[in-house]
Swiss-Prot record:
Keyword Protein biosynthesis among record annotations: no
Assembly and binders: Homotetramer. Dimer of dimers.
Cofactor note: Binds 1 heme group per subunit.
SUPFAM superfamilies membership: Indolic compounds 2,3-dioxygenase-like
Annotated Gene3D superfamilies: 1.10.287.3810, 1.20.58.480
Keywords linked to the UniProt accession: Dioxygenase, Heme, Iron, Metal-binding, Oxidoreductase, Tryptophan catabolism
Name recorded for this polypeptide: Tryptophan 2,3-dioxygenase
Positions annotated to bind substrate: 57-61, 128, 328
Pfam families in the cross-refs: Trp_dioxygenase
GO BP of this protein: L-tryptophan catabolic process to acetyl-CoA; L-tryptophan catabolic process to kynurenine; ommochrome biosynthetic process; protein homotetramerization
Residues noted as binding heme in the record, renumbered to the chain: 313
Alphabetized GO MF terms: heme binding; metal ion binding; tryptophan 2,3-dioxygenase activity
Gene: v
Assigned protein family: Belongs to the tryptophan 2,3-dioxygenase family.
Length: 380
């Protein structure tokens, strides 16, 4: 029996069959490759002293900027979807999909650093003089990513100048910076979304009150267990540890303590938003909280990967120019970059610290029938 999908052998045409008769752009025109592939201007070559690795340096940083543009594109669309009173399940799924895309892009950017490291410090020195006053500190798109994500101006490390000063008289860049500082960041929008978590209502399930009761019971059970410790020194140690844990929980149960931590920069979320994040974490196996939990996990992944990228960048800079030299843009180079690895630049710091407030699974307040019905019918 002949293959039902095979032709007769007489109707084969070597000429390519166009998918459409409409006039369109060919591959190179659509991607504007004439401009893209002609944008690598090696200053060492113009100086009649071409340095081979300058080409790699340019290509790598241009690739970074292209991916930065895509990240901004994704962040803007995600912020648009989050900027609503109610976010239905289909939108949450799309937000999760796009956040995951950003995560994969950032993984690619982290893995791109070792390619630059194939260049030796001596190779870099051959063309470094041509870079001044250019500097990665002047990457407008990376600053926009930070602002759109939620890095606050007061949280930034200042070295000699405000971060936006490097853009000098570039009014378009300064306008973009100001706009990104004023519009709602991803952090602010996620905070609003968490504040609406169903189950937090005092007139309803009132998760927060039930959680406090569960924590009190959990700690009292630990005290009771510690009191049965036959060795006095071990008993006192356990009791001291329990008191420390009680103080940790007080930092989330007492709104005044929480607000003080926010003002100090040790917390980011509002008290209500933190409650929502804890509730989603505890009940992540519930169908309605499955996607929100994925969303929170992806936000932590983004923070982690940006930190990893910063770290790889720091190590590469130290390897290329050491820890004492100034950067090409006049910043303190290695010292400045190392300072950006602190929690000051971690936007979703509170999500990383949620594990501090966990209690054993058996101590988690059970959902009653009314909240289960509400979760079935309510968008988060």
């Amino acid at each position: 029996m002949s293959c039902p999908y095979a032709g007769s052998g007489n109707d084969h045409d070597d000429a390519a069959v166009p998918l459409s008769t409409e006039v369109g752009k060919i591959y190179g025109e659509y991607l504007m490759l004439d401009k893209l592939l002609d944008a690598q201007c090696m200053l060492s070559k113009e100086d009649k002293r071409p340095v081979h690795d300058e080409h790699l340096f340019i290509i790598t940083h241009q690739a970074y900027e292209l991916w930065f543009k895509q990240i901004i594109f994704e962040f803007d669309s995600i912020r648009d979807m989050l900027d609503a009173e109610v976010i239905d399940e289909t939108k949450t799924l799309e937000i999760v999909k796009r956040l995951n895309r950003v995560v994969l892009i950032l993984k690619l950017l982290v893995d791109q650093v070792p390619i630059l490291e194939t260049m030796t410090p001596l190779d870099f020195m051959d063309f470094r003089k041509y870079l001044a006053p250019a500097s990665g500190f002047q990457s407008l798109q990376f600053r926009l990513i930070e602002n759109k994500l939620g890095v606050l101006t007061e949280q930034r490390v200042r070295y000699n100048q405000k971060y936006s000063d490097v853009f000098g008289g570039d009014e378009d860049a300064l306008t973009a910076i100001r706009s990104s500082e004023q519009e709602p960041s991803l952090l602010e929008l996620v905070q609003r979304w968490l504040e609406r978590t169903p189950g937090l209502e005092e007139s309803g399930f009132n998760f927060w009150e039930k959680f406090q009761q569960s924590v009190d019971k959990f700690l009292e059970a630990q005290v009771h267990s510690a009191m049965e410790e036959p060795v006095e020194r071990a008993k006192n140690y356990r009791l001291m540890d329990i008191e420390k844990r009680r103080e940790v929980y007080r930092s989330i149960f007492d709104p005044a303590v929480h607000d003080a931590l926010v003002r100090r920069g040790d917390r980011r979320f509002s008290h209500r938003a933190l409650q929502g994040a804890i509730m989603i974490t505890f009940y992540r196996d519930e169908p309605r909280f499955s996607q929100p939990h994925q969303l929170l996990t992806l936000l932590m992944d983004i923070d982690s990967l940006i930190t990893k990228w910063r770290y790889n960048h720091v190590i590469m800079v130290q390897r290329m120019i050491g820890s004492q030299q100034l950067g090409t843009g006049g910043s303190s180079g290695y010292q400045y970059l190392r300072s950006t690895l602190s929690d000051r630049y971690k936007v979703f710091l509170d999500l990383f610290n949620l594990s501090t407030f966990l209690i054993p699974r058996e101590a988690i307040p059970p959902l009653d029938e009314s909240i289960r019905k509400k979760l079935i019918n309510k968008s988060v």
